[in-house]
Protein backbone atom coordinates (compact mmCIF):
# COMPACT_ATOMS: atom_id res chain seq x y z
CA UNK A 1 0.00 0.00 0.00
CA UNK A 2 1.22 3.49 -0.84
CA UNK A 3 0.57 6.60 1.19
CA UNK A 4 0.60 10.27 0.26
CA UNK A 5 2.78 12.38 2.51
CA UNK A 6 1.86 16.06 2.85
CA UNK A 7 4.49 18.26 4.51
CA UNK A 8 3.93 21.81 5.71
CA UNK A 9 7.04 23.92 6.35
CA UNK A 10 6.28 26.14 9.32
CA UNK A 11 7.48 27.25 12.77
CA UNK A 12 6.95 25.73 16.22
CA UNK A 13 4.19 28.18 17.09
CA UNK A 14 1.84 26.73 14.47
CA UNK A 15 2.58 23.00 14.56
CA UNK A 16 -0.42 21.87 16.62
CA UNK A 17 -2.88 23.98 14.65
CA UNK A 18 -1.49 22.63 11.37
CA UNK A 19 -1.58 19.06 12.70
CA UNK A 20 -5.27 19.52 13.44
CA UNK A 21 -5.92 20.90 9.93
CA UNK A 22 -4.24 17.87 8.37
CA UNK A 23 -6.07 15.43 10.62
CA UNK A 24 -9.42 17.00 9.74
CA UNK A 25 -8.48 16.59 6.06
CA UNK A 26 -8.28 12.82 6.57
CA UNK A 27 -4.69 12.11 7.61
CA UNK A 28 -4.14 8.86 9.49
CA UNK A 29 -0.75 9.75 10.93
CA UNK A 30 1.12 12.91 11.90
CA UNK A 31 4.87 13.51 12.20
CA UNK A 32 6.26 16.71 13.73
CA UNK A 33 9.93 17.63 13.39
CA UNK A 34 11.87 20.60 14.76
CA UNK A 35 15.49 21.53 15.46
CA UNK A 36 15.60 19.35 18.58
CA UNK A 37 15.14 16.14 16.57
CA UNK A 38 16.23 17.08 13.03
CA UNK A 39 19.53 18.91 12.61
CA UNK A 40 18.56 20.10 9.13
CA UNK A 41 16.01 22.40 10.76
CA UNK A 42 17.38 25.55 12.36
CA UNK A 43 16.01 27.77 15.12
CA UNK A 44 12.23 27.88 15.28
CA UNK A 45 11.68 26.15 11.94
CA UNK A 46 9.49 23.03 12.02
CA UNK A 47 7.88 20.60 9.62
CA UNK A 48 4.49 18.93 10.03
CA UNK A 49 3.95 15.86 7.86
CA UNK A 50 0.69 13.98 7.44
CA UNK A 51 0.12 10.58 5.87
CA UNK A 52 -3.00 9.89 3.81
CA UNK A 53 -4.15 6.42 2.65
CA UNK A 54 -4.76 5.55 -0.99
CA UNK A 55 -8.49 5.99 -0.45
CA UNK A 56 -8.03 9.75 -0.03
CA UNK A 57 -7.44 11.78 -3.21
CA UNK A 58 -5.05 14.31 -1.71
CA UNK A 59 -4.55 16.68 -4.71
CA UNK A 60 -8.22 17.55 -4.41
CA UNK A 61 -7.72 18.52 -0.76
CA UNK A 62 -4.53 20.57 -1.18
CA UNK A 63 -6.17 23.92 -2.02
CA UNK A 64 -8.26 23.85 1.15
CA UNK A 65 -5.29 22.73 3.25
CA UNK A 66 -3.20 25.62 1.90
CA UNK A 67 -6.07 28.06 2.51
CA UNK A 68 -6.58 26.93 6.11
CA UNK A 69 -2.84 27.10 6.85
CA UNK A 70 -2.70 30.68 5.53
CA UNK A 71 -5.79 31.60 7.57
CA UNK A 72 -3.91 30.82 10.79
CA UNK A 73 -2.23 34.21 10.43
CA UNK A 74 -5.65 35.81 10.94
CA UNK A 75 -5.67 34.26 14.43
CA UNK A 76 -2.31 35.81 15.26
CA UNK A 77 -0.22 32.71 14.57
CA UNK A 78 3.04 32.91 12.68
CA UNK A 79 3.22 30.11 10.10
CA UNK A 80 6.76 30.72 8.84
CA UNK A 81 7.29 29.61 5.25
CA UNK A 82 3.87 27.95 5.12
CA UNK A 83 4.61 25.91 2.00
CA UNK A 84 2.67 22.68 1.42
CA UNK A 85 4.25 19.80 -0.52
CA UNK A 86 3.33 16.19 -1.20
CA UNK A 87 5.08 12.96 -2.14
CA UNK A 88 4.25 9.24 -2.40
CA UNK A 89 5.76 6.90 0.21
CA UNK A 90 5.65 3.14 0.72
CA UNK A 91 3.81 1.71 3.71
CA UNK A 92 6.96 0.55 5.50
CA UNK A 93 8.65 3.93 5.06
CA UNK A 94 6.24 5.88 7.20
CA UNK A 95 4.89 3.15 9.44
CA UNK A 96 8.19 2.90 11.31
CA UNK A 97 10.49 5.78 10.35
CA UNK A 98 8.54 8.49 12.18
CA UNK A 99 8.84 6.63 15.48
CA UNK A 100 12.52 7.55 15.84
CA UNK A 101 11.50 11.19 16.27
CA UNK A 102 9.23 10.50 19.23
CA UNK A 103 11.17 9.86 22.44
CA UNK A 104 10.19 9.90 26.14
CA UNK A 105 9.83 13.53 27.24
CA UNK A 106 9.87 14.77 30.81
CA UNK A 107 7.02 17.29 31.19
CA UNK A 108 7.63 18.02 34.87
CA UNK A 109 9.69 16.54 37.70
CA UNK A 110 7.15 13.76 38.15
CA UNK A 111 5.40 13.27 34.78
CA UNK A 112 6.93 11.86 31.58
CA UNK A 113 5.24 11.33 28.20
CA UNK A 114 6.27 7.97 26.75
CA UNK A 115 5.57 6.42 23.30
CA UNK A 116 3.27 3.44 23.68
CA UNK A 117 5.72 1.04 21.96
CA UNK A 118 8.75 1.67 24.21
CA UNK A 119 9.70 -0.20 27.37
CA UNK A 120 10.86 2.98 29.12
CA UNK A 121 11.01 2.58 32.89
CA UNK A 122 10.76 5.38 35.49
CA UNK A 123 14.12 6.69 36.69
CA UNK A 124 12.61 7.83 39.98
CA UNK A 125 10.02 6.10 42.17
CA UNK A 126 7.92 9.27 42.03
CA UNK A 127 7.99 9.49 38.21
CA UNK A 128 4.64 8.67 36.57
CA UNK A 129 4.35 7.73 32.90
CA UNK A 130 1.81 9.07 30.41
CA UNK A 131 1.72 6.52 27.60
CA UNK A 132 0.65 7.96 24.26
CA UNK A 133 0.13 6.75 20.71
CA UNK A 134 0.90 9.72 18.40
CA UNK A 135 -0.28 7.63 15.47
CA UNK A 136 -3.72 8.84 16.57
CA UNK A 137 -2.57 12.35 15.55
CA UNK A 138 -3.61 15.31 17.74
CA UNK A 139 -0.05 15.80 18.88
CA UNK A 140 2.47 13.81 20.85
CA UNK A 141 1.96 15.63 24.12
CA UNK A 142 5.37 17.28 23.97
CA UNK A 143 4.48 20.77 22.70
CA UNK A 144 5.41 23.75 24.96
CA UNK A 145 1.72 24.46 25.58
CA UNK A 146 1.36 20.94 26.97
CA UNK A 147 4.36 21.50 29.24
CA UNK A 148 2.76 24.70 30.55
CA UNK A 149 -0.62 23.03 31.06
CA UNK A 150 0.82 20.12 33.03
CA UNK A 151 2.98 22.44 35.12
CA UNK A 152 -0.13 24.44 36.03
CA UNK A 153 -2.01 21.26 36.91
CA UNK A 154 0.80 20.29 39.28
CA UNK A 155 0.64 23.72 40.87
CA UNK A 156 -3.09 23.74 41.67
CA UNK A 157 -4.10 20.10 42.15
CA UNK A 158 -4.02 18.51 45.59
CA UNK A 159 -6.01 15.33 44.86
CA UNK A 160 -9.69 14.50 44.96
CA UNK A 161 -10.84 17.33 42.67
CA UNK A 162 -13.41 17.39 39.90
CA UNK A 163 -11.90 18.54 36.59
CA UNK A 164 -13.15 19.43 33.11
CA UNK A 165 -10.70 19.16 30.19
CA UNK A 166 -11.99 21.34 27.33
CA UNK A 167 -10.64 20.52 23.88
CA UNK A 168 -8.98 17.36 25.16
CA UNK A 169 -7.32 16.44 21.83
CA UNK A 170 -4.96 13.55 22.61
CA UNK A 171 -6.22 13.37 26.20
CA UNK A 172 -2.77 14.06 27.64
CA UNK A 173 -4.00 16.62 30.20
CA UNK A 174 -6.71 14.30 31.49
CA UNK A 175 -4.13 11.53 31.90
CA UNK A 176 -1.81 13.92 33.75
CA UNK A 177 -4.68 15.02 36.00
CA UNK A 178 -5.51 11.40 36.82
CA UNK A 179 -1.89 10.81 37.83
CA UNK A 180 -2.12 13.89 40.06
CA UNK A 181 -5.05 12.45 42.00
CA UNK A 182 -8.11 14.01 40.38
CA UNK A 183 -11.11 11.78 41.12
CA UNK A 184 -13.68 13.02 38.60
CA UNK A 185 -12.55 13.93 35.07
CA UNK A 186 -14.72 14.94 32.12
CA UNK A 187 -12.95 15.36 28.78
CA UNK A 188 -14.66 17.13 25.87
CA UNK A 189 -13.72 17.92 22.28
CA UNK A 190 -15.81 19.19 19.39
CA UNK A 191 -14.22 16.58 17.10
CA UNK A 192 -15.31 12.95 17.47
CA UNK A 193 -11.96 11.87 15.98
CA UNK A 194 -10.21 13.64 18.85
CA UNK A 195 -12.48 11.99 21.39
CA UNK A 196 -11.72 8.58 19.88
CA UNK A 197 -7.98 9.33 19.98
CA UNK A 198 -8.21 10.41 23.61
CA UNK A 199 -10.11 7.26 24.58
CA UNK A 200 -7.48 5.13 22.83
CA UNK A 201 -4.78 6.88 24.86
CA UNK A 202 -6.81 6.49 28.06
CA UNK A 203 -6.84 2.75 27.39
CA UNK A 204 -3.02 2.80 27.49
CA UNK A 205 -3.06 4.33 30.98
CA UNK A 206 -4.91 2.31 33.67
CA UNK A 207 -4.93 5.33 35.98
CA UNK A 208 -7.57 6.94 33.72
CA UNK A 209 -10.28 4.40 34.48
CA UNK A 210 -13.57 6.24 34.92
CA UNK A 211 -12.79 9.30 32.78
CA UNK A 212 -15.84 10.45 30.82
CA UNK A 213 -14.94 11.47 27.25
CA UNK A 214 -17.59 12.92 24.95
CA UNK A 215 -17.90 15.19 21.91
CA UNK A 216 -19.07 18.68 22.85
CA UNK A 217 -18.69 22.25 21.64
CA UNK A 218 -16.69 23.94 24.42
CA UNK A 219 -18.92 24.00 27.53
CA UNK A 220 -22.29 24.44 25.81
CA UNK A 221 -24.94 22.43 27.64
CA UNK A 222 -22.55 21.13 30.29
CA UNK A 223 -23.83 20.99 33.87
CA UNK A 224 -22.07 20.08 37.09
CA UNK A 225 -19.45 22.41 38.53
CA UNK A 226 -15.74 21.60 38.68
CA UNK A 227 -12.83 22.56 40.90
CA UNK A 228 -10.55 22.93 37.88
CA UNK A 229 -11.25 23.66 34.22
CA UNK A 230 -8.28 23.33 31.86
CA UNK A 231 -8.14 24.40 28.22
CA UNK A 232 -5.13 24.28 25.92
CA UNK A 233 -6.43 25.88 22.73
CA UNK A 234 -5.80 28.83 20.44
CA UNK A 235 -6.91 32.28 21.69
CA UNK A 236 -9.61 32.45 19.02
CA UNK A 237 -11.28 29.52 20.81
CA UNK A 238 -10.42 30.58 24.37
CA UNK A 239 -12.19 33.94 23.97
CA UNK A 240 -15.69 32.42 23.47
CA UNK A 241 -14.94 29.76 26.10
CA UNK A 242 -14.17 32.16 28.95
CA UNK A 243 -17.73 33.56 29.40
CA UNK A 244 -18.99 29.98 29.86
CA UNK A 245 -16.63 29.25 32.75
CA UNK A 246 -17.97 31.21 35.79
CA UNK A 247 -21.22 29.22 35.89
CA UNK A 248 -19.28 25.95 36.07
CA UNK A 249 -16.35 26.88 38.31
CA UNK A 250 -16.64 26.11 42.00
CA UNK A 251 -15.79 28.76 44.59
CA UNK A 252 -12.04 28.68 45.10
CA UNK A 253 -11.58 26.77 41.84
CA UNK A 254 -9.17 27.48 39.00
CA UNK A 255 -9.39 27.97 35.24
CA UNK A 256 -6.09 27.02 33.57
CA UNK A 257 -5.48 28.41 30.09
CA UNK A 258 -2.71 27.56 27.62
CA UNK A 259 -2.22 27.78 23.87
CA UNK A 260 -1.76 31.55 24.21
CA UNK A 261 0.97 33.23 22.17
CA UNK A 262 2.52 36.27 23.84
CA UNK A 263 0.90 38.77 21.47
CA UNK A 264 -2.57 37.53 22.44
CA UNK A 265 -2.08 37.51 26.21
CA UNK A 266 -3.58 40.99 26.64
CA UNK A 267 -6.77 39.99 24.78
CA UNK A 268 -7.18 36.93 26.98
CA UNK A 269 -6.59 38.95 30.15
CA UNK A 270 -9.18 41.52 29.07
CA UNK A 271 -11.73 38.79 28.35
CA UNK A 272 -11.06 37.18 31.72
CA UNK A 273 -11.54 40.45 33.59
CA UNK A 274 -14.75 41.25 31.71
CA UNK A 275 -16.16 37.90 32.85
CA UNK A 276 -15.32 38.11 36.53
CA UNK A 277 -12.06 36.18 36.42
CA UNK A 278 -8.56 37.27 37.40
CA UNK A 279 -5.06 35.99 36.73
CA UNK A 280 -3.43 34.51 39.81
CA UNK A 281 -0.17 33.50 38.14
CA UNK A 282 1.37 33.35 34.67
CA UNK A 283 3.95 30.96 33.24
CA UNK A 284 6.05 31.43 30.11
CA UNK A 285 7.87 29.08 27.75
CA UNK A 286 9.31 30.65 24.64
CA UNK A 287 6.52 32.57 22.90
CA UNK A 288 3.82 30.74 24.85
CA UNK A 289 1.92 31.79 27.97
CA UNK A 290 0.00 29.78 30.54
CA UNK A 291 -2.46 31.50 32.90
CA UNK A 292 -3.70 30.26 36.27
CA UNK A 293 -6.94 32.13 36.91
CA UNK A 294 -9.79 32.17 39.41
CA UNK A 295 -13.09 33.93 40.05
CA UNK A 296 -12.83 37.43 41.45
CA UNK A 297 -13.98 37.96 45.03
CA UNK A 298 -15.26 41.05 46.84
CA UNK A 299 -11.73 41.60 48.11
CA UNK A 300 -10.20 41.81 44.61
Swiss-Prot record:
GO terms for cellular component: cytoplasm. It holds the Pfam family PrmA. GO terms for biological process: methylation. InterPro entries: Ribosomal_L11_MeTrfase_PrmA (IPR050078), Ribosomal_PrmA_MeTrfase (IPR004498), SAM-dependent_MTases_sf (IPR029063). It comes from Latilactobacillus sakei subsp. sakei (strain 23K). HAMAP family: Methyltr_PrmA (MF_00735). One of its GO terms (molecular function) is protein-lysine N-methyltransferase activity. S-adenosyl-L-methionine binds at residues 146, 167, 189, 232. Keywords: Cytoplasm, Methyltransferase, S-adenosyl-L-methionine, Transferase. PANTHER family: ELECTRON TRANSFER FLAVOPROTEIN BETA SUBUNIT LYSINE METHYLTRANSFERASE. It catalyses: L-lysyl-[protein] + 3 S-adenosyl-L-methionine = N(6),N(6),N(6)-trimethyl-L-lysyl-[protein] + 3 S-adenosyl-L-homocysteine + 3 H(+). Belongs to the methyltransferase superfamily. PrmA family. Methylates ribosomal protein L11. It is found in: Cytoplasm. Its main location: cytoplasm. Its EC number is 2.1.1.-. This is Ribosomal protein L11 methyltransferase.
Amino acid sequence: MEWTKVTVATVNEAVEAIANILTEAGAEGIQIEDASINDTLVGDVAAVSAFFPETVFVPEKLPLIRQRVLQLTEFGLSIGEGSVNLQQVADDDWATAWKKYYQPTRLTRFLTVVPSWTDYQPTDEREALIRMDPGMAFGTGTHPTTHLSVQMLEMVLRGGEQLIDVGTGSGVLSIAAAHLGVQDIRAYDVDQVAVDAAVANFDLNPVTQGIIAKPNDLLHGITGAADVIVANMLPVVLVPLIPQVPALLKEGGHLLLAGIITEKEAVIRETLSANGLMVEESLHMGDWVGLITRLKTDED
